[in-house]
Structure formats: structure tokens, C-alpha cells
Amino acid sequence: MSLTKSLLLALLAVVALAGVSAERARYDNYRLYKANAENAEQLAVLKQLESSSDSILFLDGVHIVGADVKMVVAPHKVPDLLEILGKAEIKYLLQSSDVQKTMDEIDEKVAMKGRAGEAYNWAQYYELDDTYAWLQTLAIENPGVVTLIEGGKTYQGRSILGVKITKSGKEKPGIFLEAGIHAREWIAPAAATYIINQLLTSEVEAVKQLAENYTWYVLPHANPDGYVYTHTTDRMWRKTRTPYQGCFGADPNRNWAFHWNEVGASSNPCSDTYAGPSAFSEIETLSLSNYLASLKGKIQLYISLHAYSQYLLYPYGHTGDLPDNVADFRKVYDVSIAAVNKRYGTTYTGGNIYDAIYPAAGASVDWAYGTQDVRMAFCYELRPSSNSFITGFKLPAAQIVPASEELLDSIVAMAAEVNNLGYFN
């Protein structure tokens, strides 16, 4: 059976699976607090809260002193939380007294299911099966240019579907773009599909060169099960959907076999940063890593899309030690964040993962750089900034296009500088 036919059958299975009803999680009267640990003792208190309570959803990892940590807190848990914070003298700020109301005020605008094949666009977000149908259509309409690829499988049997784009008609240096590994970060897959479309249709000379000079591998959804769950059940879901000891899922961006679970991850299955019981315990990361390994030597630039906070990051996440080619990373970083700023004045910051944002071992970019001879690997944390929206994972649909445009501007500059430095030779 051809890949196209087998994937069509898989898509039918996905549609059937997505139809199973589930009660949607709501956050009525949940509070959103921002706390900041000023010393190691206070940090330990927050870490204990993160590991022991299923009534507090941590939107940020609890890893370093001085970093803001946002917490969504169930109404019945608020008195206990405030007592604990008070005793530890941890400073906090109430940012929302009704998280559900705050979320409802943001117009994400999800497309009506089944309409993607007619007019897929970037004025709205799409469910998984509609995006997969669109990718299938691209492969049919662009023979010899777009090839449907299966980057892996999921616990629930879905395909990690993407496209390979060879606009020149022959193999060129490779760029791999992975998005959506964290399920709730909807802007990441949307931006990935925008880039696919621009590579195929743009008349802008710099974008045409980007399409023609490189072989592209783009996977908009590296965590399909989790993404489906954000549409059917819990908009704030982050992890995979593998069952573990009364809780579900591991953090797929803490599960890669490169300094796995050394720092910046949790061993608690109920934590949003649960690293899994072992490296590559998740079918998603294991199968995707196998696919990437099959491309070893063909990929020179790896890009991972996340949200939010407007960062551009490079290895490492497990240590403050810097890559041996850090001088080149900094050159690429400088031109890339300058480019992202030009169109709309959007400000990105960043640097090496460990120091710029927080320790995070077991990430995909570190694995690609550390084990696959991919000498340039970057992670974008897209819009909004950390202070722009209370629920930063819910970016209004009206911002999909501008966020994606400035990202593409940045990637154009990034690829040019990586080429200037000789990495595509």
C-alpha cells in the first residue's frame, strides 16, 4: 500500500477517534496568580506545590530563582495556596479572578470542521484532520514538489504528518521545521502551515530563494494526540496522552535522549513537565527521532516552533556551558531577531536555552544538535510577549498572519546567515 493511501486510511481513523465525545474542561472562577521565588528556599516551596497538587496548573516551569511562575488555581485551593505563599514570604500577584472568562474574551476563531480543503487560510485556527487534509491536497496538487511524509506515530495511533518540499526538483541542503510539540501552543502549527504555503506560493524574491535553495521538511503537529485533546476537552493541555499512574502524558519536549531528565523536568507523572519514565518513552518522540535519524547528514538547520514569550533560543538546555560554535550561533541569532523586528516592531530576546529562559533538558533542538550533526538548531517562542496576554497560549486569530509574517522574515535572514557561515556547504 502506498504512503498516500495508508495515510488516507489513517486520516479516516483520526476523524472517527476525534468524534468520541468528552466533557470539556472549564476554568470558571479559577484564579491566575503570578509568583516569584527570590531565593532557593522559596523555589523549593513552589517546586513542592508543582509536584504535589493536581488543583494547580503551572503555566511555567519552576526551575530558577527570580523567574516569574504563573499558576492557574482551582477555587477550593486558593486559601491553601495563599497560606503557603504567605508563610514562605513569596511575592505574588493576582492576574485574573476568572480564568475561563479571560480565555473566552480571546477570539481564537476555529474553522468549521471539514471546510479546510475549500479555502484553508490563516484568519482562523484549524483542527488536526482539516490541516492533514490540506497537506494531502498540497501533495496531490504539487506533484514532484510536495511529498507527504510521515514523521512518526502517536500513542493513540495517529500519524505525525508533514510535507517535504523540493521546489527546485532536486535535493538541496535540508531545513527541518517542527511545530506543535506542546499541544496548547496553537500559534506554532498555524505558523508552520503559513510557512508551507509561502514556500509554495510567494512571489517575494527572498522567499522564492528560500524555497528553491533548500529541501524543506515541515511537521506542523509533532504532538497530534495532545492537539486534538485541546480541541475536544482541555484547551490548556500540553503533554502527550499516554496513561501514567493515574495521570496522562509526558512532556514531549523533555523526553528526547540527550541529557534526559537531568534538569528542568519533573519525575511526577501529573506534572506538565513530566519527562516520562525514560528517554523516548513517548511513541511520538521515539518515532520522530527515528525519522530524523534516517535523514542524518541531510539536515543542516533545525527549527522548533513554540509559544509564547517572543524568544529565539539555541542549545543547550541542560547546562550553561555553550556550544563550541557559539560565536556562529550568536551571529545567526543577531540577524534573526533584527529581522523579526522590522515589519511590526516586535521585540524578541533570547540566547542559549539554559540562561535565557530556564534549564530544560531533553529538548528536540538539543538532541538534533547534540546527536545528529545538525550544527544549527534554534527554537522560536512566538507571540505574545510574556506580558501581553494573561493566557498567552490563546493568541487571537487576528494575530496569526502578523506573527507568521515576522517569523518568515526572521527565517529568511537566519537561513541567509547560516549559508554565509558555510553550514549549508
Curated annotation (Swiss-Prot):
Disulfide bonds join 247-270. Coiled coil: none annotated. The active site is at 381 (proton donor/acceptor). One of its GO terms (biological process) is proteolysis. The keyword Hydrolase applies. GO terms for molecular function: metallocarboxypeptidase activity; zinc ion binding. Residues 124-418 form the Peptidase M14 domain. Residues 1-22 form the signal peptide. SUPFAM superfamilies: Protease propeptides/inhibitors, Zn-dependent exopeptidases. Transmembrane segments: none annotated. GO terms for cellular component: extracellular space. Its EC number is 3.4.17.-. PROSITE patterns: CARBOXYPEPT_ZN_1, PEPTIDASE_M14. Binds 1 zinc ion per subunit. Belongs to the peptidase M14 family. This is Zinc carboxypeptidase A 1. It comes from Drosophila pseudoobscura pseudoobscura (Fruit fly).
